[in-house]
């Protein structure tokens, strides 16, 4: 498993590092809490 960072869609802040299987072709998108936005927002996997 590889840890990948998740960026907030609204502010671009890197808030979370989550494990992901290597060899997975799709990018991860999760709805998580962003302390900078003070709300639950969509977080996308960054490179």
From Swiss-Prot:
GO biological process assignments: translation
CC per GO annotation: cytoplasm; ribonucleoprotein complex; ribosome
Pfam families in UniProt: Ribosomal_L33 (PF00471)
PROSITE patterns referenced in this protein's UniProt entry, alphabetically: RIBOSOMAL_L33
Keyword vocabulary terms for this entry: Ribonucleoprotein, Ribosomal protein
Record bears the keyword Kinase: no
Signal peptide stretch: none
Gene Ontology MF, one: structural constituent of ribosome
InterPro entries for this protein: Ribosomal_bL33, Ribosomal_bL33_CS, Ribosomal_bL33_sf, Ribosomal_zn-bd
SUPFAM superfamilies associated with the record: Zn-binding ribosomal proteins
Oxidoreductase is among the record's keywords: no
Family: Belongs to the bacterial ribosomal protein bL33 family.
Protein name: Large ribosomal subunit protein bL33C
Name of the encoding gene: rpmG3
